[in-house]
Amino acid sequence: MTVDFHSHNFPKAIAARAIAGMCKITEGRLWAVGDGTLENHLDHMELAGVDKAVMCPIATKPSQHAVILRTARAIMDGELGERAARMIVPFVSAHPGDPDVLAHLREIAAAGIKGVKFHPYYQNFSLADPEVWPMFRAIADLGLVVQCHAGFDVGYPDRFDACGPNEIGVLLKNVHGLTFVAAHLGGCAGFAPHATDVLLECGAFIDTSALHRDWHKDEEIRLLRCWPTERLLFGTDFPWVHYPEAIRWVKSIRDPRDHEAVFGGNAARLLGL
């Protein structure tokens, strides 16, 4: 089984606008595969032999909780089609500025959703801020998985202060029992060499969604090659990467004996698949 632990798609009504907006913000350094819709995402998965994908929405304001949760439930209940129910594992997003965030997290867990996506730059918070730790403690207590942007973001070229390896380390040293997946190879590329040690010591998982990043490529290859197999998850950041290319890249670097765990076994364990 192949599981993409980091993917995105958008409702049909806003997909074209969302894709165009991201391309504009990044001044053409990101380009999309396909049209950004759920159906197109499923088509690309089928063509590449990807069995399941974790869908990672981002709540950029507290009021988006309801619509994101409603979409996740619609996928799980089959309202958006049999393929989506079978192939998509919908995460939701929580916003640290939501005054009802703890109640909303309980609602998320009660709905059977497996995890929560965060992007500290888009959501304007730092993982190292003690004010957000109660939210993450609640997530840990509820048994939910965190999928979080890590390190540099092309849309925020001057920001390195909210979700780098050091901030992740501070969070996990203060919030015990949290299953934390740091995207983009943990965001370690471009930081000091000891950044890798920080994430290893705090027990973070990382995903492989770094192929669309042309900077620090040698360092990314080193990270992908050396990271412990049991804490590495195949992820793409689709639609910003072509599935066959992402699969080839990981397979060309990791030992074939690791492929089963990296491409699906570890994800199945975290998600209870």
Give the positions of each predicted feature.
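Mid-to-C-terminal alpha-helical segments outside catalytic/metal-binding sites
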Residues: M1-F5, K12-K52, C226-L233, V241-L273
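Histidine-centered catalytic micro-motifs
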Residues: T2-K12, Q147-G151, A183
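Short beta-strand segments
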Residues: D4, V54-P57, S93, V181-H184, ...
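Conserved, mostly hydrophobic/aromatic
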Residues: H6, M45, I108, V116, ...
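A general structural detector for well-ordered alpha-helical segments in enzyme core domains, enriched
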Residues: N40-H44, I68-I75, H104-I108, E131-M135, ...
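Active-site gating/metal-coordination segments in enzymes
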Residues: D51-K52, T60-V154, D158-R159, D214
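Short helix-capping segments at alpha-helix termini
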Residues: G78-M87, N174-L178, L200-G203, W227, ...
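Catalytic pocket-lining loop regions of alpha/beta-barrel enzymes
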Residues: K114-G115, A128-L233
